Regions:
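A short, flexible loop at the N-terminus of ABC-type nucleotide-binding domains that lies
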Residues: 2-9, 17-33
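Walker A (P-loop) phosphate-binding loop of ABC-type ATPase nucleotide-binding domains
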Residues: 49-53
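Conserved ABC transporter NBD signature motif
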Residues: 70-84
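Conserved ABC ATPase "signature" region
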Residues: 108, 112, 119-137
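Conserved catalytic motifs of ABC-family nucleotide-binding domains
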Residues: 162
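Catalytic Walker B motif of ABC-type/P-loop ATPase nucleotide-binding domains
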Residues: 166-170
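ABC transporter nucleotide-binding domain
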Residues: 183-247
Length: 247
């Protein structure tokens, strides 16, 4: 198997700049020369503070926005191409499920948007609700769901068409500790089944608990890549800087 076939995501010198200000005379660089290789069959974490460029990179990989420079491939195809997009399951940050839907009708709705037949959706939905721990709650309206339950339903939506790659944007953000643990358990189960998962988070602890490899992004620049074990060992020897604010 070639190196490219063993990778689900590969970027080479990807940059993204935006024009802003009057007449677009000023520019802002959201990503600067990012080169990344994400192996198949792992939970790979993209770690960085808010505003680091994590979501920008995900949107480039999904074809939502265009890169300014560099090359990016997903599952062996150009990022954003139809061949790549149809094989990706995506859970965006702060996704919104129509509140009048139940888990069952929500999966029908999102499956139909993906072009799935109703018979194919119904063949998968109960199995997925079992996986994400919502079996028995499938006929309740999502308006009564907790944030953690909504995120787990979002995971089921992302897996509905049996994608080769699952992309998650801040999947545990705003979720209570119990809900975070439930989401981690689902993701670990998926990884044990051989799924490839690429997620971003600004929470170091979440990355440590679930990911096998990590890339650290800050101010649009890739600072470090490696295994989580290597990262935590490096952080253990790093100096601690504290900043106090107040009156």
């Amino acid at each position: 198997m070639s190196v490219s076939a063993e990778l689900v995501i590969e970027t080479a010198n990807v940059s993204k700049s935006y024009r802003r200000g009057f007449w677009g005379r000023n520019s802002f660089t959201a990503l600067n020369d990012v080169s990344l290789q994400v192996p198949r069959g792992e939970i790979y974490g993209l770690l960085g503070p808010n505003g680091a460029g994590k979501t920008t990179l995900i949107k480039i990989l999904l074809g939502i926005i265009r890169k300014s420079a560099g090359n990016a491939t997903v599952l062996g195809h150009a990022a954003g191409s139809m061949e790549a997009r149809r094989r990706i399951g995506y859970l965006p940050e702060n996704h919104r499920i129509p509140r009048h839907l139940t888990a069952l009708t929500a999966l029908e709705y999102y499956g139909s948007l993906s072009g799935m037949s109703m018979s194919a959706i119904r063949a998968e939905r109960m199995k997925l609700l079992e996986v994400v721990g919502l079996r028995g709650r499938e006929k309740e309206r999502v308006s009564g769901y907790s944030k953690g339950m909504l995120q787990r339903l979002g995971l089921a939506q992302a897996m509905l068409h049996r994608p080769d790659l699952i992309v998650l944007d801040e999947p545990t953000d705003g979720v209570d500790p119990v809900g975070r643990r439930e989401i981690r358990d689902v993701l670990k189960q998926l990884a044990d089944q051989g799924h490839s998962i690429f997620l971003n988070s600004h929470l170091l602890q979440e990355i440590e608990l679930i990911c096998s490899s990590v890339a650290i992004l800050n101010h649009g620049k890739l600072l470090k890549t490696g295994s989580v074990r290597e990262l935590t060992a490096a952080l253990a020897d790093a100096p601690v800087q504290m900043q106090l604010t107040g009156d």
